[in-house]
Regions:
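Short, charged, surface-exposed interaction patches
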Residues: 1-193
């Protein structure tokens, strides 16, 4: 008899990546730079206050568009230059990141509107401890497959021998659901004869 055994386990992500983005507009490049730098400093200071270190924080090169040079100048453009700044957190402090997300509204009082709705500004959560749980999951999948095989043997009034062949399926790690992307479901299916 050839059977498949399933093992699933829920784990919490141990790495979080969060691109924090804001936009700034101006008609003067030096003034745009000063306001971008001031807001970046405020965000970094806020992140430090929450408990993140410089090793967790990366400031990317800003993306600056000259709307006049791109032919958008139809006389209705109020600001010539538009900049998008991204400050990224890459951290193992997943719980701290989740708590900080709820406090980001505090930056509004400093005149900073954080863009969190765009696809590129959503936090990403990773689980990198697969090797720690792999042996137990393979064991659970094997036991599950054996239970299925025993049921086959019992229902057909047969006896079950030792494993002739076994293959471990591919491990998959996916979010448990869309509301808690930091909880991961690890899954493996083993095939046994």
């Amino acid at each position: 008899v050839t059977v498949k055994g399933l093992a699933e386990k829920e784990v919490k992500a141990n790495i979080a990546i969060w691109p924090i983005q804001f936009n700034q507009v101006d008609n003067d490049l030096p003034s745009l730079y000063k306001s971008m730098q001031a807001k970046t400093d405020i965000i970094v200071k806020f992140l430090h206050k929450q408990g993140f270190t410089d090793s967790d924080i990366t400031i990317s090169q800003p993306s600056i568009d000259d709307r006049q040079a791109q032919g958008y100048d139809s006389g209705n453009i109020k600001f010539r230059y538009s900049a998008q700044v991204t400050i990224s957190l890459y951290t193992s402090k997943v719980d701290l990141l989740l708590a900080t997300q709820n406090k980001m509204v505090q930056l509004v009082k400093d005149g900073i509107a954080i863009s969190n709705q765009s696809y590129g500004a959503r936090p990403e959560f990773l689980y990198t401890g697969l090797n720690d749980i792999k042996p137990q999951m393979v064991q659970a999948a094997t036991q599950n497959a054996r239970e299925v095989a025993l049921k086959f043997a019992k229902d057909s009034d047969s006896s079950l021998g030792k494993i002739k062949t076994a293959s471990q399926g591919q491990f998959s790690i996916s979010p448990r659901d869309s509301n808690t992307p930091y909880i991961k479901k690890v899954r493996v299916v083993s095939t046994l004869t």
